[in-house]
Every structure is written in structure tokens, then in C-alpha cells.
């Protein structure tokens, strides 16, 4: 037996060597094949981040500035609405009544202003530039215009009457002046005759042909005529003075009238400005009786449910949430991955709220990258927020599934492809890089 073993021992060694060589070659081939595959095969890589569906323009609150009473409620929870669509119509009874009062008052002031402007210019008639029928019913407008025209004619007639009385008095004084002038001319003629007669009588008296009494009588008559002339001159001057006073009175009448009209006109202009502002405010309030949707979307958190309910100023009545085409995903990217993120990068989104077996991933792209990191106050974790917009054609693959703000999402941000060997060696190279930097 021992001899047999010794005889076959070299053969066994050769067989084992052959097996070892075969295994070694096979191992080298396997290592070379795997290494070649790892070095040449590229795998798609992506950064994975959590996200949430948000609204581009955010959810819009529907509020009313002044509040009021609900007249009509035109929507219900979950309704789809278009931008500008009427959601709630407030009761407008009080607003319309207030506007009617303001417009009626404004029409009166417009008519009064036209009359006063015509009176100030001394016109024989007036026209109103504004169409009063826009402010009050046609019959009321006609009555208002007719009333102002009657007042215009009455005031014009009253002024004309006062001026007529003064003109009559002035004409009387003119006649009086004329009569006094005639009397003065007669006195002057009489004085001239007495003077001639007195000259002749003085000559005869010097010759002793006439008595002294005759001379004295003529001188007395002359003195009386001169006194009368003085009184007539004074009376004529007084009459002329009164005539001048009448002229001043006529001027004063016009001046007082213009002053009164100017004051009234100033007051009316101020009132018109005030009521025009009030009309603008009332018209705006009337326009805001219709509470409309600020954008297209769906109604949520409807707070008003009954007609005749009271709305407080600034109260949130409902939310309008834009639908999927206006939605984006906000993702939180770790700080060590931000250097690989660029605007326009392709992204795949998986909405975890849906059935993962039947719901396809949605294609999207990065639209904004935050310039600075954000720290979550609750957890203390830091991250960079990204905005990712789903592509419309990819959203269509959801086949009727709706996205809503707040839904969770998982995003895969595609980055450069890497070989398998780079995945295997990266931890080692990172450790070596840190090791070589130690002091």
C-alpha cells in the first residue's frame, strides 16, 4: 500500500496543480470581466428628496372689505370656478338707496351751479352741461331743471325791478335838474333886466327925477332874485348828487349780487366735489356687491352657508385653490447635494398618496433653486428648497387623479451618469482624501 502511494504521488500533485491553475485563470477572468463591466457600465444616478405639493400663487382667500348681508350664495364646497366668476352677491338695498340719495343731491348741485354761472355772467338763460337723467329719473330731472329756471327768472326779475326803481328815481331827478336849470335861466334873465333898469333909475335918481323908494325897490328885487338863484343852484346840485348816488346804488346792486353768487358758487363747487367722491365710493361699493373668484380653481373651507347671513369686514369667506396645472412641488434638498442641482434639470416625481403599482411617475423639471439654505425651526435640519414644475403632458398620465396642495411627494433629481466602479470606490477615495489631510 505504501509503495502504491509513493508510486502515484507525483501524478496527484500534477493534477492538483492543473486544477489550481484552472481555478486561478477562471478567477482572473471573472475579476477582469466584472471589473471591465464595473468600469464601463454607467448607471443613472439621482438625488432623492422629499417634497410637498404647493400652489404657485398660493391659496387665495376670498374676503370683503366692508362686509354686508348675503343676498345670494352661488357656490358650494368643492365647486370648480373660473376667475371673475360671482361667488356671493350681497344684498344691495341700503347701498342702492344711499347711491340714489347721493346722485339726486348731486343733480341738484349741478343744476344750481349752471344757474349761478349764468347769473354771474348776466346771461338771459342757462343750460346744464351734465345729463341729469343719468342721476335721477327723467321726470324728476325735468322738474328740477324747471324749478331752477323759475328761480333764475325770478331772481333776474327781482334784480331788474330794483334797478328799474332806481332808474325811475334817477329820471325824476334828471327832470328836477332840468326844471331847476330853466328856473335859473329865468332868474338870470330877470337879474339882467333889473340891472339895466337899475342903471337907468340911478341916473334919474341922481337928477332928482325919481324917488329913492324906486331905487330901493329895484335893489330889493335884485337881492331876492339872487337869493332864489342861489337856492336853485343848491337844489340842482343836490339833485345831481342824488342821481350820482343812484348810479352807485345800481353798481352796488350788481356788486352785491356778484359777491353773493360767487359765495354760493364756491359752496356749490365744494359740495359737488364732496358728493362726486361720495358717488365714486358708493358706486365702488355697489360694484363690490358681487364677490368674485380671484383665480380659477376649486372652492374649499366655505364659511357662508345661508342667505341673509352677515359678513364681517375682512372675514375669510372661502378659499380658492388652483388646480393641478397651477401646482408645483417644493422639495427639500440636503446641503451636500445642492452643488449638483441646476435649473432645468429633469426630475421624476412619485406621489406617495396614490397607488404606486398603478400610478406612473410624473416627469418634471427644476424651475427655481433657493439662493440660501433654510433651517426647519421644528427639527433644526437645514436644507435648500427647490421648486419643481410637473410637465402638463406627463400630468395627463394620472388619468383623472387630482393633485391638491399639501400632498406628499418623492422626487428623483437626475444628475450625471456614473460607472459602477465609481460607486464602489467613492467611499474609499473619500476616506483616503480625508486621511491625507490629517495633521
Curated annotation (Swiss-Prot):
GO terms for cellular component: plasma membrane. The keyword Membrane applies. It is a single-pass membrane protein. Belongs to the membrane fusion protein (MFP) (TC 8.A.1) family. Part of a type I secretion system composed of PrsD and PrsE. The chain crosses the membrane at residues 20-40. Its main location: membrane. Mediates secretion of glycanase ExsH. It holds the Pfam family HlyD_3. It is found in: Cell inner membrane. GO terms for biological process: protein transport; transmembrane transport. This is Type I secretion system membrane fusion protein PrsE. Keywords: Cell inner membrane, Cell membrane, Membrane, Plasmid, Transmembrane, Transmembrane helix, Transport. It comes from Rhizobium meliloti (strain 1021) (Ensifer meliloti).
Amino acid at each position: 500500500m505504501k509503495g502504491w502511494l509513493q508510486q502515484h504521488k507525483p501524478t496527484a500533485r500534477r493534477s492538483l496543480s492543473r486544477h489550481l491553475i484552472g481555478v486561478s485563470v477562471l478567477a482572473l477572468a471573472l475579476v477582469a470581466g466584472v471589473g471591465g463591466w464595473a468600469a464601463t457600465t454607467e448607471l443613472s444616478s439621482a438625488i432623492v428628496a422629499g417634497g410637498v405639493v404647493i400652489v404657485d400663487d398660493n391659496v387665495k382667500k376670498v374676503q370683503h372689505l366692508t362686509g354686508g348681508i348675503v343676498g345670494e350664495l352661488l357656490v358650494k364646497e368643492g365647486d370648480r370656478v373660473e376667475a371673475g366668476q360671482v361667488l356671493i352677491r350681497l344684498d344691495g338695498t341700503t347701498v342702492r338707496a344711499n347711491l340714489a340719495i347721493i346722485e339726486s343731491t348731486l343733480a341738484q348741485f349741478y343744476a344750481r351751479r349752471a344757474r349761478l354761472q349764468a347769473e354771474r355772467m348776466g346771461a338771459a338763460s342757462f343750460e346744464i352741461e351734465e345729463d341729469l337723467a343719468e342721476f335721477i329719473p327723467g321726470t324728476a330731472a325735468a322738474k328740477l331743471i324747471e324749478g331752477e329756471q323759475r328761480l333764475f327768472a325770478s331772481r333776474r326779475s327781482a334784480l331788474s325791478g330794483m334797478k328799474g326803481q332806481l332808474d325811475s328815481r334817477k329820471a325824476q331827478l334828471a327832470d328836477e335838474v332840468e326844471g331847476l336849470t330853466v328856473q335859473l335861466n329865468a332868474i338870470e334873465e330877470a337879474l339882467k333886466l333889473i340891472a339895466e333898469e337899475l342903471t337907468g333909475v340911478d341916473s334919474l335918481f341922481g337928477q332928482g327925477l325919481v324917488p329913492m323908494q324906486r331905487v330901493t325897490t329895484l335893489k330889493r328885487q335884485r337881492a331876492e332874485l339872487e337869493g332864489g338863484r342861489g337856492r336853485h343852484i343848491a337844489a340842482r346840485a343836490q339833485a345831481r348828487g342824488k342821481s350820482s348816488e343812484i348810479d352807485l346804488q345800481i353798481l352796488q346792486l350788481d356788486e352785491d349780487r356778484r359777491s353773493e353768487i360767487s359765495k354760493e358758487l364756491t359752496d356749490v363747487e365744494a359740495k359737488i366735489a364732496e358728493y362726486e367722491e361720495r358717488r365714486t365710493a358708493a358706486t365702488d361699493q355697489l360694484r363690490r356687491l358681487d364677490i368674485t373668484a380671484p383665480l380659477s380653481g376649486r372652492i374649499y373651507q366655505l364659511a357662508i352657508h345661508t342667505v341673509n347671513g352677515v359678513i364681517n369686514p375682512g372675514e375669510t369667506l372661502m378659499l380658492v385653490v388652483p388646480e393641478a396645472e397651477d401646482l408645483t412641488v417644493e422639495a427639500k434638498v440636503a446641503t451636500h447635494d445642492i452643488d449638483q442641482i441646476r435649473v432645468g434639470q429633469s426630475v421624476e416625481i412619485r406621489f406617495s398618496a396614490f397607488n404606486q403599482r398603478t400610478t406612473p411617475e410624473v416627469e418634471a423639471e427644476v424651475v427655481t433653486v433657493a439662493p440660501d439654505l433654510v433651517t426647519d425651526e421644528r427639527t433644526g435640519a437645514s436644507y435648500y428648497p427647490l421648486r419643481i414644475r410637473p410637465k402638463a403632458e406627463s400630468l395627463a398620465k394620472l388619468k383623472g387623479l387630482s393633485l391638491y396642495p399639501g400632498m406628499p411627494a418623492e422626487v428623483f433629481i437626475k444628475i450625471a451618469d456614473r460607472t459602477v466602479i465609481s460607486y464602489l470606490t467613492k467611499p474609499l477615495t473619500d476616506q483616503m482624501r480625508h486621511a491625507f489631510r490629517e495633521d
